[in-house]
């Protein structure tokens, strides 16, 4: 209770699995029973193309949480940008009253480890030592490439002429 009050919060929702999934839940979609939400199109691109039912689960549990909590606003991390876009579409397409419209679904910058800039994520906690060492490399390369691109832009180098130097910098 003290930690919640310290951050200006009086309540926290800690639902039990059986409350959220009264018919039970299994990872095998063919065996699932009950109502589920699917956002067609957006859910089947990028990450959804290799995990075809992932966003179905996200959309379903977020819908349930929104129905229980009825938030004025919702906040999602930028590291899961596709998820945030799917949720914005969900909120608009199903005419959610809480939060009322996608303008109240906010995307916040990714929180990163100050040492190596790896995104702080529940999934990243499962990385072994080697994976933990390698994981920040992509973000470092992207930031380096962005720096080169932006530097060339300040020198009025045309976008078409920025590609080669940017790619060379990150290799």
Residue map of PLM features:
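Nucleotidyltransferase catalytic core that binds NTPs
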Residues: 1-171
């Amino acid at each position: 209770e003290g930690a919640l009050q310290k951050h200006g919060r009086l309540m926290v929702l800690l639902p039990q699995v059986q409350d959220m999934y009264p018919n039970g839940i299994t990872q095998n979609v063919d065996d699932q029973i009950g109502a589920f939400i699917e956002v067609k199109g957006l859910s089947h691109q990028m990450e959804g193309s290799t995990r075809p039912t992932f966003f179905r689960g996200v959309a379903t549990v977020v819908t349930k949480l929104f129905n229980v909590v009825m938030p004025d606003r919702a906040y999602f991390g930028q590291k899961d940008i596709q998820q945030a876009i799917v949720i914005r579409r969900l909120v608009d397409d199903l005419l959610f009253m809480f939060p009322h419209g996608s303008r109240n679904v906010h995307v916040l910058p990714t929180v990163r480890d100050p040492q190596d800039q790896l995104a702080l994520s529940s999934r990243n906690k499962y990385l072994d030592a080697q994976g933990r060492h390698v994981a920040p490399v992509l973000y470092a390369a992207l930031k380096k490439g962005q720096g080169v691109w932006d530097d060339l832009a300040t020198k009025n180098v045309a976008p078409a002429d920025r590609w080669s130097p940017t790619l060379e910098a990150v290799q």
